[in-house]
Design a protein with these regions (language model features):
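Intrinsic low-complexity, disordered N-terminal segments enriched in polar/charged/small residues
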Residues: 2-6, 21, 25-27, 34
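Bacterial Sec-dependent N-terminal signal peptides
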Residues: 32, 37-38, 42, 46-82
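Short internal beta-strands
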Residues: 128-134
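Glycine-rich, charge-decorated loop segments at or immediately adjacent to ligand/cofactor-binding or catalytic sites
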Residues: 139-144, 213-235
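Glycine-rich oxoanion-binding loops at beta->alpha junctions
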Residues: 148-177, 189
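Conserved anion/nucleotide-ligand pocket segment
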Residues: 236-306
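Glycine-rich, aromatic-lined ligand/substrate-binding cores of catalytic
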Residues: 279-356
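Conserved functional hotspot residues or short segments at active or partner-binding sites
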Residues: 326, 330-428
Protein backbone atom coordinates (compact mmCIF):
# COMPACT_ATOMS: atom_id res chain seq x y z
CA UNK A 1 0.00 0.00 0.00
CA UNK A 2 1.35 3.49 -0.73
CA UNK A 3 2.30 5.62 2.25
CA UNK A 4 0.43 8.69 3.45
CA UNK A 5 2.42 11.90 3.48
CA UNK A 6 1.77 15.46 4.57
CA UNK A 7 2.81 18.59 2.83
CA UNK A 8 2.12 22.31 3.07
CA UNK A 9 0.54 23.74 -0.04
CA UNK A 10 0.61 27.40 0.90
CA UNK A 11 -1.05 29.76 3.37
CA UNK A 12 -4.78 30.23 2.96
CA UNK A 13 -6.55 32.03 5.79
CA UNK A 14 -10.01 30.89 4.89
CA UNK A 15 -12.17 27.96 5.93
CA UNK A 16 -10.22 25.31 7.88
CA UNK A 17 -10.96 22.14 5.98
CA UNK A 18 -12.85 20.64 3.12
CA UNK A 19 -12.73 17.59 0.85
CA UNK A 20 -11.68 17.76 -2.74
CA UNK A 21 -12.40 15.01 -5.21
CA UNK A 22 -10.88 14.64 -8.65
CA UNK A 23 -12.64 11.98 -10.69
CA UNK A 24 -10.84 9.97 -13.37
CA UNK A 25 -7.69 12.05 -13.34
CA UNK A 26 -5.13 10.80 -15.89
CA UNK A 27 -1.53 11.98 -16.12
CA UNK A 28 -0.04 11.77 -19.61
CA UNK A 29 3.32 9.99 -19.90
CA UNK A 30 3.27 9.10 -16.20
CA UNK A 31 2.28 5.49 -16.56
CA UNK A 32 -0.37 5.96 -13.87
CA UNK A 33 -4.09 6.45 -14.05
CA UNK A 34 -6.20 7.42 -11.03
CA UNK A 35 -9.86 6.48 -11.20
CA UNK A 36 -10.61 8.14 -7.87
CA UNK A 37 -8.51 10.56 -5.90
CA UNK A 38 -9.38 12.11 -2.54
CA UNK A 39 -7.43 14.68 -0.54
CA UNK A 40 -8.12 16.24 2.83
CA UNK A 41 -7.04 19.84 3.32
CA UNK A 42 -6.80 20.94 6.94
CA UNK A 43 -5.43 23.95 8.73
CA UNK A 44 -2.11 23.65 10.54
CA UNK A 45 -0.80 26.90 11.99
CA UNK A 46 -2.86 29.00 9.56
CA UNK A 47 -1.72 27.01 6.55
CA UNK A 48 -3.51 24.45 4.47
CA UNK A 49 -2.00 20.98 4.65
CA UNK A 50 -2.96 18.20 2.27
CA UNK A 51 -2.91 14.51 3.08
CA UNK A 52 -2.49 12.57 -0.16
CA UNK A 53 -1.50 9.09 -1.16
CA UNK A 54 2.01 9.12 -2.62
CA UNK A 55 2.28 7.59 -6.08
CA UNK A 56 5.19 9.28 -7.76
CA UNK A 57 7.08 12.47 -6.93
CA UNK A 58 6.70 14.02 -10.37
CA UNK A 59 3.07 13.04 -10.57
CA UNK A 60 2.46 14.31 -7.05
CA UNK A 61 3.90 17.71 -7.91
CA UNK A 62 1.66 18.11 -10.93
CA UNK A 63 -1.33 16.83 -9.01
CA UNK A 64 -0.84 19.36 -6.22
CA UNK A 65 -0.54 22.15 -8.79
CA UNK A 66 -3.91 21.14 -10.19
CA UNK A 67 -5.46 20.95 -6.75
CA UNK A 68 -4.06 24.33 -5.71
CA UNK A 69 -6.18 25.91 -8.41
CA UNK A 70 -9.24 24.15 -7.01
CA UNK A 71 -8.29 25.16 -3.46
CA UNK A 72 -8.12 28.82 -4.41
CA UNK A 73 -11.54 28.69 -6.06
CA UNK A 74 -13.19 27.03 -3.05
CA UNK A 75 -11.35 29.15 -0.49
CA UNK A 76 -12.48 32.37 -2.11
CA UNK A 77 -16.07 31.35 -1.46
CA UNK A 78 -15.49 30.44 2.19
CA UNK A 79 -15.77 32.92 5.04
CA UNK A 80 -14.24 32.77 8.48
CA UNK A 81 -16.50 31.02 10.95
CA UNK A 82 -16.36 29.17 14.25
CA UNK A 83 -13.71 26.44 14.20
CA UNK A 84 -14.15 23.47 16.50
CA UNK A 85 -11.22 21.82 18.22
CA UNK A 86 -11.54 18.80 15.93
CA UNK A 87 -11.06 20.97 12.85
CA UNK A 88 -7.67 22.17 14.09
CA UNK A 89 -5.83 19.00 13.20
CA UNK A 90 -2.45 20.71 13.36
CA UNK A 91 -2.97 21.45 17.05
CA UNK A 92 -3.34 17.83 18.10
CA UNK A 93 -1.96 15.57 15.37
CA UNK A 94 1.62 15.76 16.74
CA UNK A 95 0.33 14.54 20.14
CA UNK A 96 -0.98 11.34 18.55
CA UNK A 97 2.18 10.20 16.79
CA UNK A 98 3.15 6.67 17.77
CA UNK A 99 0.35 6.41 20.34
CA UNK A 100 -2.48 3.95 20.80
CA UNK A 101 -5.67 6.00 20.83
CA UNK A 102 -9.26 5.55 21.94
CA UNK A 103 -11.90 8.05 20.83
CA UNK A 104 -15.04 8.94 22.80
CA UNK A 105 -17.33 9.88 19.96
CA UNK A 106 -20.76 9.86 18.40
CA UNK A 107 -22.37 11.15 15.21
CA UNK A 108 -21.47 14.75 16.11
CA UNK A 109 -17.71 14.04 16.07
CA UNK A 110 -17.10 15.43 12.62
CA UNK A 111 -14.34 17.29 10.81
CA UNK A 112 -16.27 19.00 8.04
CA UNK A 113 -17.99 16.13 6.20
CA UNK A 114 -15.77 13.39 7.60
CA UNK A 115 -16.15 11.65 10.94
CA UNK A 116 -13.23 12.28 13.30
CA UNK A 117 -12.50 8.55 13.57
CA UNK A 118 -12.39 8.21 9.77
CA UNK A 119 -10.15 11.28 9.56
CA UNK A 120 -7.72 9.91 12.15
CA UNK A 121 -7.57 6.51 10.47
CA UNK A 122 -6.94 8.15 7.09
CA UNK A 123 -4.00 10.01 8.60
CA UNK A 124 -2.50 6.81 9.94
CA UNK A 125 -3.37 7.37 13.60
CA UNK A 126 -3.47 4.11 15.56
CA UNK A 127 -7.08 4.16 16.76
CA UNK A 128 -7.61 1.06 18.90
CA UNK A 129 -11.26 1.45 19.87
CA UNK A 130 -14.21 3.80 20.21
CA UNK A 131 -16.13 4.56 23.41
CA UNK A 132 -19.81 5.23 22.67
CA UNK A 133 -22.05 7.42 24.92
CA UNK A 134 -25.84 7.42 25.29
CA UNK A 135 -27.48 6.96 21.85
CA UNK A 136 -24.37 5.05 20.68
CA UNK A 137 -21.37 5.74 18.48
CA UNK A 138 -23.54 6.42 15.42
CA UNK A 139 -26.23 8.24 17.45
CA UNK A 140 -29.20 6.09 16.49
CA UNK A 141 -30.32 4.57 19.82
CA UNK A 142 -33.25 5.77 21.92
CA UNK A 143 -32.83 7.94 24.99
CA UNK A 144 -32.13 5.63 27.92
CA UNK A 145 -31.63 2.58 25.70
CA UNK A 146 -28.86 0.38 27.08
CA UNK A 147 -26.32 -0.61 24.46
CA UNK A 148 -23.96 -3.56 24.25
CA UNK A 149 -20.36 -3.53 23.10
CA UNK A 150 -20.13 -4.12 19.36
CA UNK A 151 -18.00 -3.73 16.26
CA UNK A 152 -18.46 -0.70 14.03
CA UNK A 153 -19.26 -2.08 10.56
CA UNK A 154 -17.79 0.93 8.76
CA UNK A 155 -14.33 0.84 10.37
CA UNK A 156 -14.11 -2.60 11.96
CA UNK A 157 -13.16 -0.97 15.26
CA UNK A 158 -14.44 -2.34 18.56
CA UNK A 159 -17.02 -0.04 20.14
CA UNK A 160 -17.15 -0.11 23.94
CA UNK A 161 -20.53 1.09 25.16
CA UNK A 162 -20.49 3.57 28.04
CA UNK A 163 -24.26 3.35 28.28
CA UNK A 164 -24.72 -0.35 28.90
CA UNK A 165 -23.34 -2.73 31.48
CA UNK A 166 -20.97 -0.01 32.66
CA UNK A 167 -20.68 3.74 32.19
CA UNK A 168 -17.02 4.07 33.04
CA UNK A 169 -14.16 2.55 31.03
CA UNK A 170 -12.66 -0.36 32.95
CA UNK A 171 -9.00 -0.88 33.71
CA UNK A 172 -9.01 -3.56 30.99
CA UNK A 173 -10.47 -1.04 28.51
CA UNK A 174 -7.69 1.42 29.34
CA UNK A 175 -4.83 -1.07 29.56
CA UNK A 176 -3.61 -0.85 25.96
CA UNK A 177 -4.13 2.91 25.51
CA UNK A 178 -1.68 5.80 25.47
CA UNK A 179 -4.30 8.54 25.09
CA UNK A 180 -8.05 9.08 24.98
CA UNK A 181 -9.69 11.72 22.76
CA UNK A 182 -13.10 13.13 23.74
CA UNK A 183 -15.02 14.83 20.94
CA UNK A 184 -18.78 15.06 21.48
CA UNK A 185 -21.16 17.96 20.92
CA UNK A 186 -22.91 18.95 24.15
CA UNK A 187 -25.91 21.28 24.54
CA UNK A 188 -25.03 22.84 27.90
CA UNK A 189 -27.81 21.32 30.03
CA UNK A 190 -27.06 19.46 33.26
CA UNK A 191 -29.32 16.51 32.57
CA UNK A 192 -27.92 15.93 29.07
CA UNK A 193 -25.76 12.90 29.81
CA UNK A 194 -22.65 13.59 27.74
CA UNK A 195 -21.08 15.55 30.62
CA UNK A 196 -21.65 12.55 32.88
CA UNK A 197 -19.87 10.35 30.35
CA UNK A 198 -17.08 12.93 30.33
CA UNK A 199 -16.85 12.66 34.13
CA UNK A 200 -16.43 8.88 34.07
CA UNK A 201 -13.93 8.99 31.20
CA UNK A 202 -11.87 11.53 33.16
CA UNK A 203 -11.98 9.30 36.24
CA UNK A 204 -10.81 6.30 34.21
CA UNK A 205 -7.99 8.36 32.71
CA UNK A 206 -6.93 9.60 36.16
CA UNK A 207 -7.01 6.14 37.70
CA UNK A 208 -5.06 4.54 34.84
CA UNK A 209 -2.64 7.41 34.16
CA UNK A 210 -3.84 7.89 30.59
CA UNK A 211 -3.88 11.47 29.22
CA UNK A 212 -7.16 12.91 27.98
CA UNK A 213 -7.44 15.22 24.99
CA UNK A 214 -10.73 17.15 24.72
CA UNK A 215 -11.49 18.67 21.33
CA UNK A 216 -13.77 21.54 22.27
CA UNK A 217 -17.02 22.46 20.58
CA UNK A 218 -19.30 25.51 21.02
CA UNK A 219 -22.21 25.33 23.44
CA UNK A 220 -25.47 26.28 21.66
CA UNK A 221 -26.90 27.24 25.07
CA UNK A 222 -23.65 28.81 26.21
CA UNK A 223 -24.91 32.40 26.26
CA UNK A 224 -26.58 32.25 29.72
CA UNK A 225 -26.75 30.34 32.98
CA UNK A 226 -30.01 29.55 34.75
CA UNK A 227 -31.85 27.12 36.96
CA UNK A 228 -31.34 25.60 40.39
CA UNK A 229 -27.84 24.48 41.35
CA UNK A 230 -28.04 20.77 42.15
CA UNK A 231 -27.37 19.74 45.75
CA UNK A 232 -25.44 16.54 45.05
CA UNK A 233 -25.47 15.62 48.74
CA UNK A 234 -29.24 15.14 48.35
CA UNK A 235 -29.61 14.07 44.71
CA UNK A 236 -26.96 12.63 42.43
CA UNK A 237 -27.49 10.49 39.33
CA UNK A 238 -26.33 10.11 35.74
CA UNK A 239 -28.62 13.02 34.77
CA UNK A 240 -27.16 15.21 37.52
CA UNK A 241 -23.69 14.51 38.88
CA UNK A 242 -22.32 17.94 39.72
CA UNK A 243 -23.28 21.05 41.75
CA UNK A 244 -24.00 23.18 38.70
CA UNK A 245 -27.12 24.99 37.44
CA UNK A 246 -29.49 23.34 35.02
CA UNK A 247 -28.01 25.56 32.27
CA UNK A 248 -24.31 25.97 33.04
CA UNK A 249 -23.08 28.13 30.14
CA UNK A 250 -19.82 26.23 29.55
CA UNK A 251 -18.34 24.34 26.63
CA UNK A 252 -17.38 20.70 27.09
CA UNK A 253 -13.71 21.73 27.30
CA UNK A 254 -14.36 24.33 29.98
CA UNK A 255 -16.52 21.84 31.85
CA UNK A 256 -13.70 19.27 31.81
CA UNK A 257 -11.32 21.88 33.23
CA UNK A 258 -13.83 22.59 36.01
CA UNK A 259 -14.21 18.90 36.89
CA UNK A 260 -10.44 18.66 37.18
CA UNK A 261 -9.86 21.99 38.91
CA UNK A 262 -12.63 21.61 41.48
CA UNK A 263 -11.54 18.02 42.27
CA UNK A 264 -15.02 16.69 41.52
CA UNK A 265 -13.71 13.35 40.26
CA UNK A 266 -13.80 10.40 42.67
CA UNK A 267 -11.28 10.78 45.45
CA UNK A 268 -10.43 14.30 44.30
CA UNK A 269 -8.26 12.87 41.52
CA UNK A 270 -7.20 14.85 38.48
CA UNK A 271 -6.45 13.53 35.02
CA UNK A 272 -3.78 14.81 32.63
CA UNK A 273 -6.03 17.04 30.56
CA UNK A 274 -5.40 18.94 27.34
CA UNK A 275 -8.12 21.02 25.67
CA UNK A 276 -7.97 22.22 22.07
CA UNK A 277 -10.19 25.34 22.16
CA UNK A 278 -12.51 26.57 19.44
CA UNK A 279 -11.58 29.61 17.40
CA UNK A 280 -13.77 32.59 16.53
CA UNK A 281 -16.19 31.71 19.35
CA UNK A 282 -17.40 33.62 22.41
CA UNK A 283 -20.16 32.96 24.92
CA UNK A 284 -22.26 35.54 23.09
CA UNK A 285 -22.11 33.48 19.89
CA UNK A 286 -25.41 31.91 18.86
CA UNK A 287 -24.13 28.67 17.39
CA UNK A 288 -26.43 26.47 15.32
CA UNK A 289 -25.32 22.85 15.32
CA UNK A 290 -24.46 21.32 11.93
CA UNK A 291 -25.57 17.85 13.12
CA UNK A 292 -28.32 17.00 15.59
CA UNK A 293 -26.70 16.11 18.94
CA UNK A 294 -29.18 13.30 19.66
CA UNK A 295 -32.19 11.77 17.89
CA UNK A 296 -34.77 13.91 19.69
CA UNK A 297 -33.05 17.28 19.33
CA UNK A 298 -33.27 17.62 15.55
CA UNK A 299 -33.43 21.43 15.25
CA UNK A 300 -31.84 24.53 16.72
CA UNK A 301 -35.22 25.49 18.22
CA UNK A 302 -35.49 22.13 20.00
CA UNK A 303 -32.00 22.65 21.45
CA UNK A 304 -32.99 26.09 22.75
CA UNK A 305 -36.27 24.77 24.18
CA UNK A 306 -34.66 21.70 25.73
CA UNK A 307 -33.77 23.25 29.14
CA UNK A 308 -37.43 24.20 29.63
CA UNK A 309 -39.16 21.22 28.06
CA UNK A 310 -36.74 18.69 29.50
CA UNK A 311 -38.40 19.30 32.87
CA UNK A 312 -41.64 17.85 31.45
CA UNK A 313 -39.91 14.45 31.38
CA UNK A 314 -40.49 14.54 35.14
CA UNK A 315 -44.26 14.70 34.55
CA UNK A 316 -46.87 12.54 32.86
CA UNK A 317 -46.95 14.84 29.81
CA UNK A 318 -45.48 14.36 26.35
CA UNK A 319 -42.76 16.51 24.78
CA UNK A 320 -43.70 15.16 21.35
CA UNK A 321 -41.18 12.32 21.21
CA UNK A 322 -42.31 10.08 18.38
CA UNK A 323 -43.22 13.01 16.11
CA UNK A 324 -41.30 15.12 13.61
CA UNK A 325 -40.95 17.90 16.20
CA UNK A 326 -39.71 16.44 19.52
CA UNK A 327 -39.06 19.07 22.22
CA UNK A 328 -41.00 21.63 20.19
CA UNK A 329 -44.43 20.84 21.64
CA UNK A 330 -46.04 19.70 24.89
CA UNK A 331 -49.27 17.81 25.35
CA UNK A 332 -51.41 15.14 26.95
CA UNK A 333 -54.57 13.34 25.80
CA UNK A 334 -56.59 15.34 28.35
CA UNK A 335 -54.82 18.71 27.99
CA UNK A 336 -57.61 20.60 26.22
CA UNK A 337 -56.07 24.07 26.36
CA UNK A 338 -55.48 24.68 22.65
CA UNK A 339 -56.63 23.30 19.29
CA UNK A 340 -53.20 21.82 18.51
CA UNK A 341 -53.11 18.02 18.22
CA UNK A 342 -50.31 15.51 17.70
CA UNK A 343 -50.03 11.73 17.84
CA UNK A 344 -46.72 10.09 18.83
CA UNK A 345 -45.70 6.96 16.95
CA UNK A 346 -42.82 4.52 17.20
CA UNK A 347 -39.97 6.03 15.18
CA UNK A 348 -36.20 5.70 15.02
CA UNK A 349 -34.82 7.26 18.20
CA UNK A 350 -38.19 7.00 19.98
CA UNK A 351 -39.41 3.42 19.75
CA UNK A 352 -41.72 3.66 22.78
CA UNK A 353 -42.76 7.31 23.16
CA UNK A 354 -45.26 8.31 25.85
CA UNK A 355 -48.85 8.04 24.54
CA UNK A 356 -47.75 5.99 21.54
CA UNK A 357 -50.52 6.06 18.90
CA UNK A 358 -52.72 8.20 21.17
CA UNK A 359 -53.77 11.72 20.16
CA UNK A 360 -52.47 14.45 22.47
CA UNK A 361 -53.69 18.02 22.89
CA UNK A 362 -51.46 20.90 23.83
CA UNK A 363 -49.17 23.66 22.64
CA UNK A 364 -47.17 23.86 19.43
CA UNK A 365 -44.06 25.89 20.31
CA UNK A 366 -42.65 25.98 16.79
CA UNK A 367 -44.19 29.42 16.35
CA UNK A 368 -41.79 30.92 18.88
CA UNK A 369 -39.09 32.76 16.99
CA UNK A 370 -35.44 31.86 17.39
CA UNK A 371 -34.69 35.52 18.13
CA UNK A 372 -37.07 35.58 21.08
CA UNK A 373 -35.62 32.36 22.54
CA UNK A 374 -32.09 33.73 22.23
CA UNK A 375 -33.09 37.11 23.68
CA UNK A 376 -35.07 35.66 26.59
CA UNK A 377 -32.08 33.51 27.58
CA UNK A 378 -33.70 31.73 30.50
CA UNK A 379 -35.66 28.64 31.44
CA UNK A 380 -39.41 29.05 30.96
CA UNK A 381 -41.18 27.81 34.10
CA UNK A 382 -44.58 29.19 33.14
CA UNK A 383 -45.36 26.24 30.87
CA UNK A 384 -44.63 23.77 33.68
CA UNK A 385 -46.51 25.75 36.34
CA UNK A 386 -49.56 26.28 34.11
CA UNK A 387 -49.65 22.60 33.17
CA UNK A 388 -49.48 21.58 36.83
CA UNK A 389 -52.36 23.92 37.68
CA UNK A 390 -54.46 22.42 34.89
CA UNK A 391 -53.89 18.88 36.22
CA UNK A 392 -53.65 19.83 39.90
CA UNK A 393 -56.32 17.31 40.87
CA UNK A 394 -54.18 14.48 39.47
CA UNK A 395 -51.61 13.37 42.09
CA UNK A 396 -49.45 11.62 39.50
CA UNK A 397 -48.69 14.75 37.44
CA UNK A 398 -45.10 14.76 38.73
CA UNK A 399 -42.97 11.63 38.90
CA UNK A 400 -39.79 10.85 40.82
CA UNK A 401 -37.62 11.63 37.79
CA UNK A 402 -38.19 15.36 38.27
CA UNK A 403 -36.06 15.31 41.43
CA UNK A 404 -33.18 13.84 39.46
CA UNK A 405 -33.62 16.40 36.69
CA UNK A 406 -34.03 19.52 38.82
CA UNK A 407 -33.49 18.54 42.45
CA UNK A 408 -36.30 17.97 44.98
CA UNK A 409 -37.10 21.64 45.66
CA UNK A 410 -38.70 22.57 42.34
CA UNK A 411 -41.58 20.15 42.72
CA UNK A 412 -42.23 21.34 46.28
CA UNK A 413 -42.16 24.97 45.19
CA UNK A 414 -44.67 24.42 42.39
CA UNK A 415 -46.97 22.33 44.59
CA UNK A 416 -46.84 25.05 47.26
CA UNK A 417 -48.08 27.60 44.73
CA UNK A 418 -44.92 29.69 44.41
CA UNK A 419 -44.81 31.99 41.39
CA UNK A 420 -42.18 31.77 38.69
CA UNK A 421 -40.52 34.94 40.01
CA UNK A 422 -40.41 33.55 43.55
CA UNK A 423 -38.89 30.29 42.35
CA UNK A 424 -36.33 32.11 40.24
CA UNK A 425 -35.38 34.27 43.21
CA UNK A 426 -34.58 31.12 45.20
CA UNK A 427 -31.95 30.19 42.61
CA UNK A 428 -29.96 33.42 42.74
CA UNK A 429 -27.58 32.70 45.61
CA UNK A 430 -26.54 29.39 44.08
CA UNK A 431 -26.12 30.98 40.66
CA UNK A 432 -23.87 33.71 42.06
CA UNK A 433 -21.65 31.15 43.78
CA UNK A 434 -21.46 29.02 40.66
CA UNK A 435 -20.60 32.03 38.51
CA UNK A 436 -17.51 32.57 40.67
CA UNK A 437 -16.42 28.98 40.06
CA UNK A 438 -17.28 29.08 36.37
CA UNK A 439 -15.20 32.17 35.64
CA UNK A 440 -12.01 30.37 36.65
CA UNK A 441 -12.29 27.97 33.73
CA UNK A 442 -13.60 30.07 30.86
CA UNK A 443 -11.62 29.80 27.63
CA UNK A 444 -13.73 32.35 25.74
CA UNK A 445 -15.00 35.88 26.21
CA UNK A 446 -18.09 35.73 28.42
CA UNK A 447 -21.58 37.04 27.66
Amino acid sequence: MPATEMFTIGPVNERPSFRLKVMRFAMKNSGFKIDYFSANVVEIEHEKVMFVTTIDFCMRTRLISLLLITVSVFAAACSRSVMTGAQQVGEYLPMLSGKRIAVVANQTSVVERSHLVDTLLAMGVNVKCVFGPEHGFRGQADAGEHLSDNTDPQTGLPVVSLYGKHRKPTAADMDSLDMVIFDIQDVGVRFYTYISTLHYVMEACAENNVPLLVLDRPNPNGFYIDGPVLDTAVTRSFVGMHPVPLVHGMTIGEYAMMLNGEHWLAGGKQCRLTVVPCRNYTHSTHYQLPIKPSPNLPTYRSVLLYPSLGLFEGTFMSVARGTEFPFEAIGHPDYNVAPFRFTPHSVSGAKYPPFKDVECCGYDLRGISIDSLETDARINLKWLIDSYKYFQSKPDFFNSFLSRLAGPELRKQIEQGMTEDEIRQSWQDGLRKFQTIRKKYLLYEDF
